[in-house]
Design a protein with these regions (language model features):
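Intrinsic-disorder-associated, low-complexity terminal segments enriched in Asp/Asn/His/Tyr and depleted
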Residues: 2-7
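A generic alpha-helix propensity feature with a strong bias for hydrophobic helices
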Residues: 8-9, 97
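Basic, often amphipathic N-terminal segments
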Residues: 16-127, 142, 146-226, 242-257
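Short, conserved secondary-structure transition motifs
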Residues: 128-140, 237-244
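Low-complexity, intrinsically disordered Gly/Pro/Thr-rich segments
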Residues: 222, 231-240
Length: 257
């Protein structure tokens, strides 16, 4: 597997050392995910990482911006979960690796799939998504949905089956019949026709005035990087050592030309 030159060899070596934990029988084993994440030298990656307070490609903390009307401690708390996952949009949700396959198998297949899809552009804007704040795009944009669907279908062989407790946890949310079928058949509810692209910026924020303050702050913070369309030229492999660990971006796969 060729590692992109932007990525730290030290980080990759750290990851390889953790591979032995994949043999653990417990559910709390490492997970992988395929995300859209901006190129690590892009402005969007930089300001997105700053917003969350962590760079997922290096794992290093970053000072968060000041949001008018919101204390720094509160802002830190409402970005806690997104900070752990990194600045991204989910294409194939986190999964444990099927023991019949290796990391090299997963990377090779992901690289081949990437090469079959051409780069494209999307327009992002700050929106409320339920009680979350997120960067979202036109839901009618088909290229992103098609890419996500291909990844879900063609990489499913690498996904270990969900444990019953994982299914039960997902079902604590209100799922439609379609979402529940997706969960049982593919390991995640929000795929195919139920997919909605979003880059999560906050936890659920129940107080509307707080959501409005933070949404306004996000619009200001991201404004310069969202003036132009965002190019989707790669997809990324993320890795989580355990359920208590943060996700790390360990490789990007360039889309075909």
């Amino acid at each position: 597997v060729n590692i992109d030159s932007h990525y730290s060899l030290k980080l990759w070596e750290f990851y390889v050392k953790q591979m032995k934990t994949l043999l653990k029988p417990a559910s709390d084993t490492p997970r992988f995910a395929i995300y859209f994440a901006p190129e690590i030298d892009s402005k969007l990656h930089s300001i997105g990482s700053q917003w969350l307070g962590r760079d997922s490609s290096s794992g290093k903390p970053i000072k968060q911006p000041y949001i008018k009307g919101i204390s720094s401690s509160y802002f830190c708390s409402v970005t806690k979960t997104p900070r752990r996952y990194g600045f991204h949009a989910t294409l194939k949700a986190p999964f444990r690796l099927n023991k019949e396959f290796t990391l090299k198998d997963l990377c090779s297949k992901t690289q081949r799939l990437s090469a079959l899809n051409k780069p494209f552009s999307i327009d992002l804007k700050v929106q409320e998504f339920g009680n979350f704040i997120a960067l979202m795009m036109d839901p009618n944009e088909q290229k992103m949905q098609n890419l996500a669907s291909k990844l879900v279908e063609n990489l499913d062989q690498f996904r270990a089956p969900l444990h019953q407790e994982e299914i039960d946890k997902r079902r604590t949310s209100t799922l439609t019949n379609s979402e529940d079928r997706n969960l049982l058949n593919w390991g995640y509810p929000y795929i195919f026709n139920d997919f909605r692209f979003h880059i999560t910026l906050t936890e659920r924020i129940q107080v509307r005035s707080d959501r409005e303050f933070i949404a306004s702050g996000a619009s200001s913070h991201f404004s310069k990087s969202l003036d132009n369309a965002t190019t989707v030229s790669s997809i990324s492999l993320f890795f989580q050592e355990s359920s208590k660990a943060d996700f790390l971006q360990i490789q990007q796969f360039t889309l075909g030309k």
